[in-house]
C-alpha cells in the first residue's frame, strides 16, 4: 500500500485524487494532507480519510480544527505545508497546490526522499534547474500529473529519448478560442470560467483561456524531458482527445488518447508504470469521433504563449517573473480589477522591466517572485 501525502486536497486535482483513493482503499492511504480555506470540505475529508497530519493556511483555522480533531496533528501557513510534505510516514507526495507556494514543499520532499507526483507546474517553471538537480542527486523521478506531460511520459515508455524530433503539446484553445482579440475586451469572469472540455479550478481555467497555462506546460516539458524549446510545439486539438504526442527522427508519431478526465493522469502518476481500472460514466469509444481536428497556434491571437516561450528561452529568473505576474493579474481579473485582455499586458510589462539573473539560487528566485508580485499589484 502506498501512503500518500496530498497537498491541495480541496482543489480540483485534490478532489479527483481522493476519488481515486476512495475507489482503491487497498492500494492507497492518505496519511497527511493540506487544504487552504475551504473548511467545510476540509472537515469532511479529515473525517473520511483520517490523516495523521494536516496543514491549513490560517492560524485561526488550525486552532479550530485542533479542538475538533484532537488525534490529528495540525500546522498552518507555508511552514505547515513544508511539515506535511516531509511527513515521515509518507511514501509519495502529490503536490496539487496552486501557484509558486508549491516550490519549497516539493524541494523539501525531494530532500526527504519522497516519490514526487507533480501537479504544481509552477515548481518547475520557477526553479526547474534546482528541482531537477535535487531530484537527480536523490535519484528521484518526478512523475507528471498534467494530462499533457503524462501523455508524453507514456509515449516515451521504452523509447530512446535521444531519437526525439519534437514534443507536441496539444491545447483545447480554452473558453475563448473562437473570439477575436477585439471581442475579448467584453468578456466576463463567468464566461471565462466555462471551459469547453475540462473541469478545472478557476485559476487554471483562466490560464487555459489566455494560454498562459500552455506556456507554463511548455516550460514544464522542457525540464521534465530535457527537450529544447525549439523542439516543443503547441497545436490546437479542439476535442481534447489526443493529450499530446512525440515525433521521432524517423518521422513517426506516438500519441496518447483518452477521455478528458484528470483521473487518468493522476492515477498513472500514483501507479506508474502500472495501470488501474477507472469507472467512467461513459465508455470512451474512438468510433464516437468521426474526425479529430488540429490547428496551428496564432501567436498574435494568443500572445501569452509567445511570452512564455520567450521567458523560457531567456531563462534565469524570467520564468519566475512571468509566473508571479500572471498569478497576480489573474487574481485581479477574478476580483473584477482587471479586464481579461489586460492579463497579458501586465505580464509583458513585468517582463520588460526585469533583467534576468542567470542560474539563480533559491533565495534569489523567492525574492524576484515577491518583488514581481508587489510591482504588479501596484498596476491593478
Curated annotation (Swiss-Prot):
Give residues annotated as binding 1-deoxy-D-xylulose 5-phosphate.
121, 147-148, 172, 195, 208, 213-214, 217
The Gene Ontology biological process annotation of the record reads: isopentenyl diphosphate biosynthetic process, methylerythritol 4-phosphate pathway involved in terpenoid biosynthetic process
Domain of life from the UniProt record: Bacteria
- EC number per UniProt: 1.1.1.267
Q: Which Pfam families match?
A: DXP_redisom_C, DXP_reductoisom, DXPR_C
Per UniProt, the keywords (alphabetical) are: Isoprene biosynthesis, Manganese, Metal-binding, NADP, Oxidoreductase
Which pathway does it serve? Isoprenoid biosynthesis; isopentenyl diphosphate biosynthesis via DXP pathway; isopentenyl diphosphate from 1-deoxy-D-xylulose 5-phosphate: step 1/6
Q: Does the keyword Nuclease apply?
A: no
GO molecular function terms noted in the UniProt entry:
1-deoxy-D-xylulose-5-phosphate reductoisomerase activity; manganese ion binding; NADPH binding
Q: Which residues bind NADPH?
A: 10-13, 36-38, 120, 122, 201
Q: Give me the reactions it catalyses.
A: 2-C-methyl-D-erythritol 4-phosphate + NADP(+) = 1-deoxy-D-xylulose 5-phosphate + NADPH + H(+)
Which leading EC class covers this enzyme?
oxidoreductase
> Which NCBIfam families does the record associate with it?
Dxr, PRK12464.1
Its biological purpose is as follows: Catalyzes the NADPH-dependent rearrangement and reduction of 1-deoxy-D-xylulose-5-phosphate (DXP) to 2-C-methyl-D-erythritol 4-phosphate (MEP).
Tell me which HAMAP family the record gives: DXP_reductoisom
What is the protein's given name? 1-deoxy-D-xylulose 5-phosphate reductoisomerase
Species source reads Listeria monocytogenes serotype 4a (strain HCC23)
